[in-house]
Amino acid sequence: VELTGEEKAAVLALWDKVDEDKVGGEALGRLLVVYPWTQRFFDSFGDLSTAAAVMGNPKVKAHGKKVLHSFGDGVHHLDDLKVTFAQLSELHCDKLHVDPENFRLLGNVLVVVLAQQFGKAFTPELQAAYQKVVAGVANALAHKYH
């Protein structure tokens, strides 16, 4: 990811304030509500029939937490995202057959959730830096696709 030193510092400073457990469930839940076709990868999660069911689903929250912990690993390894996400890329490509476009969608949803959580502290400059980060993570996750 091409970030200036200032952008990296700002991304890391904000990330240290992120409640990964809460934000992860919120971001994944929103993805599943706004882009309902992504639900097909989560058949084992039970009731995803309404927005309220999705947002209150404990399996969605648990998986969102896991996703955001992995994203946090990426935030701390911005210069080596392909290596950081190599195993997850392989898993999502070869075993789960997830459309890599879903990584971009989730990244964009995450930026919205961060903006909601941090309000005015999530400046336009910080948003631009996070857009670069989520794009880099999405590209790293799509790396193993043929």
Swiss-Prot record:
Keywords: Acetylation, Heme, Iron, Metal-binding, Methylation, Oxygen transport, Phosphoprotein, Transport. GO terms for cellular component: blood microparticle; haptoglobin-hemoglobin complex; hemoglobin complex. The keyword Nucleotide-binding does not apply. The modification Phosphoserine is found at S44. SUPFAM superfamilies: Globin-like. The modification N6-succinyllysine is found at K17, K59. The modification Phosphothreonine is found at T123. GO terms for biological process: hydrogen peroxide catabolic process. Heterotetramer of two alpha chains and two beta chains. Involved in oxygen transport from the lung to the various peripheral tissues. This is Hemoglobin subunit beta-1. The gene is HBB1.
